[in-house]
């Protein structure tokens, strides 16, 4: 474990970070980020006096970046208490974690932490100090990215009743997760079932986590209501598309210094993340190829001028490979075995299993620098694997810009307020925020860009059948 428990001058030590001395740097960057996050800061100002999250004890599992620090401080400004961990072993910005710890917020995040560390920290964000009378205190809200915090409580509760659910791990990550659950159950056989019923709800940030929630609900396993933040238009069409359009290339270039112009860039998946990734590569004059399973998305890619191919075909021709599907083994061992010498392979989807990284463990790995590895095949060929197949934009870069994260985190904050304040209105299920709140976030964001919205006249509003103040589109409208 490469983390260290750092103790501050006020004896607050409920955190695990890399280096508390980085907090000054973190604070300076947080102040800059605030100026680029108009939507989130406007919500902080609007609701601060009302304290709508007073009494909320939020377990947060999301990338511990500078932008997330602004989110944490916003939740606290609205009355919440939080405990935080990163949702990815490589995505933490250590100076951001230090700034949050120095301010007295429990945070457990170190860039490059091990998988064992990761699951230990995910447990720690559910472990609150007892109250003044010595009574136990539990989380009552979850703010999740990828669904790991939600998964932990559900799987652990099942394991209390049937330990066999931990018998057959399917990956290195599951081995570490299952071992972590076994360790906690050995100390407290009801650790999970004591905490699960206390959760009022979860707000989920990303596509992969949303898929998990819908599947759990379909199977009757979801224990509390969830708000799907990912499918708010001002999240998915902005964070997923415009955020990836800027952060993908930043991560690749920081890692490799490669010239992108003229190279064949293969984008696996043409959803919102794939669209942004393809735009980024084309903007730097790459030859962009797209792989897709969905004929509609494939047709969109073709109409944008991209060449639509299969990965089987692209493998031996591509120079740069980017997975953004949310699926499993999109790039397999056999694909990588066919790739050119020095081909670059990376992922911008949430989990590392889009690329069959486990199959590469049999070969020699030569570390170039943090999160950049040469994989050396028996014939001497090398491919460059970035962030061990995890999120390249956060593993090798600093993630999305503050401005676009303002939209996402404004939605997260609104969702936390809505679910915490109106829990009785949400039976167990998966929900999205109403369109008028989506439009509110967009209005707040527009102010930063010196934009001017046209106002409908009464006659115009009546003619198209909408309210002058919106919402302007029906729920089924596709932006």
UniProtKB/Swiss-Prot annotation:
Q: Which gene encodes it?
A: ahcY
Q: SUPFAM superfamilies this protein is in?
A: Formate/glycerate dehydrogenase catalytic domain-like (SSF52283), NAD(P)-binding Rossmann-fold domains (SSF51735)
Tell me the superkingdom of the source.
Bacteria
PROSITE patterns, per database record? ADOHCYASE_1, ADOHCYASE_2
Its GO CC terms are: cytosol
* Any one Gene Ontology BP term: one-carbon metabolic process
Q: Indicate the family of this protein.
A: Belongs to the adenosylhomocysteinase family.
The positions annotated for binding substrate are 65, 145, 205, 235, 239
Q: What's this protein's name?
A: Adenosylhomocysteinase
- Give, as one word, the top-level EC class: hydrolase
Cystine residue pairs: none
One Pfam family name is AdoHcyase_NAD
Keywords tagged on the record? Cytoplasm, Hydrolase, NAD, One-carbon metabolism
Q: Which residues form a coiled coil?
A: none
UniProt-listed SMART domains: AdoHcyase, AdoHcyase_NAD
Chief localization: cytoplasm
């Amino acid at each position: 474990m490469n983390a260290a428990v750092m103790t501050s001058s006020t004896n607050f030590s409920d955190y695990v970070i890399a280096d508390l001395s980085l907090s000054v740097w973190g604070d300076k960057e947080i102040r800059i980020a605030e100026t680029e996050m108009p939507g989130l800061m406007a919500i902080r100002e609007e609701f601060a006096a009302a304290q709508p999250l007073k009494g909320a004890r939020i377990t947060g599992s999301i990338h511990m970046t500078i932008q997330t620090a602004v989110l944490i401080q916003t939740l606290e400004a609205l009355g919440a208490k939080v405990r935080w961990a990163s949702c990815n072993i490589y995505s933490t910005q250590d100076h951001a974690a230090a700034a949050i710890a120095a301010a007295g917020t429990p945070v457990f995040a170190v860039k490059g932490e091990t998988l064992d560390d990761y699951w230990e920290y995910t447990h720690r964000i559910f472990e609150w100090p007892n109250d003044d009378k010595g009574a136990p205190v539990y989380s009552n809200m979850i703010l999740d990215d990828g669904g790991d915090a939600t998964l932990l409580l559900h799987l652990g509760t099942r394991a209390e009743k049937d330990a066999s659910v931990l018998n057959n791990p399917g990956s290195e990550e599951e081995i570490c997760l299952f071992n972590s659950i076994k360790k906690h159950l050995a100390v407290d056989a009801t650790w999970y079932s004591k905490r699960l019923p206390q959760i009022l709800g979860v707000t989920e940030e990303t596509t992969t986590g949303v898929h998990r929630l819908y599947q759990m609900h379909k199977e009757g396993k979801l224990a509390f209501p969830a708000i799907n933040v990912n499918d708010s238009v001002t999240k998915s069409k902005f964070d997923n598309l415009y955020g990836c359009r800027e952060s993908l290339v930043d991560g690749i270039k920081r890692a490799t210094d490669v010239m992108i112009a003229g190279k064949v860039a293969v984008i696996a998946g043409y959803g919102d993340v794939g669209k942004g990734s393809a735009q980024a590569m084309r903007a730097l004059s790459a030859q962009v190829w797209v792989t897709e399973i969905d004929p509609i998305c494939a047709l969109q890619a073709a109409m944008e001028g991209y060449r639509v191919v299969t990965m089987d075909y692209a493998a031996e021709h591509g120079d740069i490979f980017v997975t953004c599907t949310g699926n499993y083994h999109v790039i397999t061992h056999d694909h990588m075995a066919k790739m050119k010498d020095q081909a670059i392979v990376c992922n911008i989807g949430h989990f590392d299993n889009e690329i069959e990284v486990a199959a590469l463990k049999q070969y020699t790995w030569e570390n170039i620098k943090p999160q950049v590895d040469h994989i050396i095949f028996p014939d001497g060929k090398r491919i460059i694997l970035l962030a061990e197949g995890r999120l390249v934009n956060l593993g090798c870069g600093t993630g999305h810009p503050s401005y676009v994260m303002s939209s996402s985190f404004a939605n997260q904050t609104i969702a936390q307020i809505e679910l915490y304040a109106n829990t009785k209105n949400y039976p167990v299920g998966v929900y999205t925020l109403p369109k008028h709140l989506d439009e509110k976030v967009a209005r707040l964001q527009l102010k930063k860009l010196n934009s001017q919205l046209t106002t409908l006249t009464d006659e115009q509003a009546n003619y198209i059948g909408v309210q002058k103040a919106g919402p302007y589109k029906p729920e089924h409208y596709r932006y």
